[in-house]
Amino acid sequence: DRVVDGTDRFAQYAIAAAVQAVDACGMDELDAERTAVVIGTSCGGTETIADSQRSLDLEGPTGVDRKLQIKAWTNMAAGQIALRWKLHGPLLTVTTACASSIDAIGTAARMIERGDCDVAIAGGCEASRTQVTMIAAGIYGMLSPQPDPYKACRPFNTERFGIMGGEGAGVIILERADLAKARGAKIHGYLRGYASLSDGFHPSSSNPDGSW
């Protein structure tokens, strides 16, 4: 399969999630010029880069994946989704660490509000659990040492220990409310607002006073 051969796992997750979302939304077809794709990812194709570095070390230049560039670029999750449905609307990738997915959804909603598009395929994906990234996260002190999975990842708890590595994708379909109602869509919810900011405190820690 050319799509699988030409994509990193992070993009494959996004494509699979987008297919499920589009199938569930009930549209007969997407308007190619009025549909946007906005996908968030923090790391992109780290697995492809790690595998190619390993092959380079063992085999030399001939071992490097010839498609490394198009597989590793963070924009290729959104790009592959647009390619699948031959879309010509706005195409964006959002990379804001742990906020990438929600920022992608919020950005897509604002694009609909501005009239840039009527529909948006929006969400996020990640597949960065390579040996080197997990070791680095552990050395940096990011990973939770808690063995109980129900207590290991509690980011908003005062007794939090750290984060856990995970991967996957989540994609939703945003649509102008009047259009969704007119076609009798099953509406799961309304996005009433969105905000994005930085606390300007630390590269990886939130300000403990919670002011931002």
Can you describe what each PLM-predicted range is?
Residues 47-62, 111-114, 134-147, 208-211:
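A glycine- and small-aliphatic-rich helix-loop capping segment at beta-alpha/alpha-beta transitions
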Residues 148-212:
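Condensing-enzyme catalytic core mediating Claisen C-C bond formation in acyl metabolism
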Residues 116-120:
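Short, high-confidence coil segments that cap the C-terminus of an alpha-helix
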Residues 124-159:
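Phosphate/pyrophosphate-binding betaalpha-module
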Residues 101:
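Short conserved active-site loop signatures built around small residues
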Residues 1-96, 125-134:
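Conserved beta-ketoacyl condensing-enzyme motif
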